[in-house]
């Protein structure tokens, strides 16, 4: 599975994005949750990064 995520996911709206938009797939981030993708999903691939909007996640990994 490929998690590219969307801009909305990167902002932590909790919406799973799709397509190579270069941001992240957030899961309730910004509300103290955690998910895939940091605020800037282009930073690092497959490595755990802190989410700028709260929680933990992985920036854009394949």
UniProtKB/Swiss-Prot annotation:
Tissues expressing the protein: Expressed in skin during two hair growth cycles. Expression restricted to the cortical cells of hair follicles, appearing first in the cortical cells processing the flat nuclei located a few cells above the dermal papilla.
Its GO CC terms?
cytosol; intermediate filament
Question: Which region ranges are annotated with the description 14 X 2 AA repeats of G-[YCGS]?
Answer: 5-56
At the top level, the lineage of the source is Eukaryota
Among Pfam families, the record links this protein to:
KRTAP
| UniProt entry keywords in alphabetical sequence | Keratin, Repeat
Function statement: In the hair cortex, hair keratin intermediate filaments are embedded in an interfilamentous matrix, consisting of hair keratin-associated proteins (KRTAP), which are essential for the formation of a rigid and resistant hair shaft through their extensive disulfide bond cross-linking with abundant cysteine residues of hair keratins. The matrix proteins include the high-sulfur and high-glycine-tyrosine keratins.
Q: Which family does it belong to?
A: Belongs to the KRTAP type 19 family.
| Self-association and partners | Interacts with hair keratins.
**Family annotation (PANTHER family):** KERATIN-ASSOCIATED PROTEIN 19-3-RELATED (PTHR38140), KERATIN-ASSOCIATED PROTEIN 19-4-RELATED (PTHR38140:SF5)
Would you tell me the protein name for this molecule?
Answer: Keratin-associated protein 19-5
